[in-house]
Swiss-Prot record:
Coiled coil: none annotated. GO terms for molecular function: 2 iron, 2 sulfur cluster binding; dihydroxy-acid dehydratase activity; magnesium ion binding. Homodimer. GO terms for cellular component: cytosol. HAMAP family: IlvD. Keywords: 2Fe-2S, Amino-acid biosynthesis, Branched-chain amino acid biosynthesis, Iron, Iron-sulfur, Lyase, Magnesium, Metal-binding. Binds 1 [2Fe-2S] cluster per subunit. This cluster acts as a Lewis acid cofactor. Mg(2+) binds at residues 78, 120-121, 440. The keyword Nucleotide-binding does not apply. The modification N6-carboxylysine is found at residue 121. Functions in the biosynthesis of branched-chain amino acids. Catalyzes the dehydration of (2R,3R)-2,3-dihydroxy-3-methylpentanoate (2,3-dihydroxy-3-methylvalerate) into 2-oxo-3-methylpentanoate (2-oxo-3-methylvalerate) and of (2R)-2,3-dihydroxy-3-methylbutanoate (2,3-dihydroxyisovalerate) into 2-oxo-3-methylbutanoate (2-oxoisovalerate), the penultimate precursor to L-isoleucine and L-valine, respectively. This is Dihydroxy-acid dehydratase.
Length: 550
């Protein structure tokens, strides 16, 4: 066991003494050491309940002959960080979490890990850190939040972001907005739609890293506690079997997860996180081109918020990820999982599917996959749109650019009534390096939707979008403006041509004009010159490479 390096022999007498000071016994030291990686925090609703899950996981470890050690990572709530400088820290926090998991597990000689994340960057961050060690691990995602209800109608967090836009144009009163505020977020769990946190939980299960039904079992469901306990027991078996993550995370496993993502219409942020996770196994193991290639293989089969009417609870009751795998089984390749059964065995074991929620491949919600990669002179290395949440009339759109050099400038313009039908809003210098931190543009996209402009106005950015964004929102434009990308050359009035069916995005300018404009820009001046974000800005790769640190 790896932990023998910490606890075995006379030379480790001081090490054992320190463990005994924590209450561990000689008998405990004969067993596998299992790290319980918790991300409990009192400021994030997705993580407020994780103490209960960590206790259950520890019980499972003890019951099956292991010794658990709990430690914590940070966890940022994207919703609370949204719309201000705090959002610059969200994506960069993924790397801090990965470093923390790697450091703690290696320093203390853990033989295996139970990862307990919920929200957006915490799920990939923990997995990335654990992969660097290549020791057995299992993931217990914290589970979705139930939607709230007011006057017979269901609400969730995105209802409030869009509600701000509705209030601005007089669709609702301030009193009505306050009532929705008080009920929309019903308690513990990740936001109730297929946003980034739940998208990553679904893909974690599809990768084979969580037990079946873990992704969609809700935070307040006792089944989540039982899954945590079972996962604690399972990790001890995995350590004894030496089932390493690289035995599970093959190229085929990643492609399975991408197919599930495309079929469900998950968050565009998955195109950052899946390549970043794969990068811990091998450089460019999975790239944006894999999403592009696989998007031609599956249709969009589930109409889930923000692009549809259903919530995560509906997906769960329809059969969860096993049911999705069952529907896609002709495309899925067989791979190992932490469950002990293969991914296709799990798919074949499904007893019930609600085909009103999880459509058959031959009767999809949309013929095209839920995500689309676009390329052209505006984004030579690619950009991403959640086409499953776009009005069909905006699949193809040509319009004049209105250019803003930050999210804050754009929000002021939108709420100030400066955007009209047909416009293409361009928000730049918000990329991984330029932002820095690649902020999510949920506030401007929600304002556009709330004001009823989502079927006539497009938005493109080198930043990114919340999983809750809907409408013609095209993000991750690469190269970014700070790196001299073409998006930096766009001026007000330039015609932007978008064709989501043909996967193209271009600015109607001659190459000579683009080169001339870029040559006049000079070298990008970093916005932040000290602290973590200053270091991050210098080291981060482009969005098409997963925004990983070089």
């Amino acid at each position: 066991m790896i932990s023998d390096n910490v606890k075995k022999g006379v030379i480790r007498t001081p090490n054992r003494a320190l463990l005994k000071a924590c209450g561990y016994t000689d008998e405990d030291m004969e067993k596998p050491f299992i790290g319980i990686v918790n991300s409990f925090t009192e400021v994030v609703p997705g993580h407020i309940h994780l103490r209960t899950l960590s206790e259950a996981a520890k019980h499972g470890v003890y019951a099956n002959g292991g010794t658990p050690f709990e430690f914590n990572t940070i966890g940022i709530c994207d919703g609370i960080a949204m719309g201000h400088e705090g959002m610059k820290y969200s994506l960069p926090s993924r790397e801090i979490i990965a470093d923390a998991v790697e450091s703690m597990a290696r320093a203390h000689g853990f033989d295996g890990l139970v990862l307990i994340p919920t929200c957006d960057k915490i799920v990939p961050g923990m997995i990335m850190g654990a992969l660097r060690l290549n020791i057995p691990f299992i993931v217990v995602t914290g589970g979705p939040m139930l939607p709230g209800e007011f006057q017979g109608k269901k609400y969730e967090l995105i209802s409030l972001f869009e509600g701000v836009g509705e209030y601005q144009v007089g669709k609702i009163t301030e009193e009505e907005l306050k009532c929705i505020e008080d009920c929309a977020c019903s308690g513990a769990g990740s936001c109730a739609g297929l946003y980034t946190a739940n998208s990553m939980a679904c893909l974690t299960e599809a990768l084979g890293l969580s037990l079946p039904m873990c992704a969609t079992t809700h935070a307040v469901d006792a089944q989540k506690v039982r899954l945590a306990k079972k996962s604690g027991s399972k990790i001890v078996d995995m350590v004894k079997e030496d089932l390493k993550p690289t035995d599970i995370l093959t190229k085929e496993a990643f492609e399975n997860a991408i197919l599930v993502d495309l079929a469900l219409g998950g968050s565009t942020n998955t195109t950052l996180h899946i390549p970043a996770i794969a990068n811990e196994i091998e450089n460019k193991f999975i790239t944006l081109d894999d999403f592009d290639r696989l998007s031609d293989e599956v249709p969009h089969i589930a109409s889930i918020k923000p692009g549809g009417e259903h919530y995560m609870i509906d997906l769960h009751n329809a059969g969860g990820i096993p049911a999705v795998l069952n529907v896609l089984k002709e495309k899925i390749r067989d791979t190992k999982t932490v469950d002990g059964r293969s991914i296709l065995e799990i798919a074949e074991s499904v007893k019930y599917i609600n085909y009103d929620v999880i459509r058959k491949v031959e009767a999809p919600v949309h013929e095209t996959a839920g995500l689309r990669v676009l390329k052209g002179n505006l984004a030579p290395n690619g950009c991403v749109v959640k086409i499953g949440a776009v009005h069909p009339k905006m699949y193809k759109h040509d319009g004049p650019a209105k250019v803003y050099n930050s999210e804050d400038e754009a929000i002021s313009a939108i709420l100030g009534g400066k955007i009209v039908e047909g416009d293409v809003i361009v928000i730049r210098y918000e990329g991984p390096s330029g932002g820095p931190g690649m902020r999510e543009m949920l506030s401007p996209t929600s304002a556009i939707c709330g004001m009823g402009l989502d079927d006539s106005v497009a938005l493109i950015t080198d930043g990114r979008f919340s999983g809750g964004s809907r409408g013609p929102c095209i993000g991750h434009v690469s190269p970014e403006a700070a790196a001299g990308g073409v998006i930096a050359a766009i001026e007000n009035g330039d015609i932007i041509k978008i064709d989501m069916i043909e996967k193209e995005i271009n600015v109607d300018l001659d190459e000579s004009v683009i080169k001339e404009r870029l040559s006049k820009l000079g070298e990008f001046e970093p916005k932040i010159k000290k602290g973590y974000l200053s270091r991050y800005s210098k080291l981060v790769s482009s969005a098409d490479e997963g925004a990983v640190l070089k």
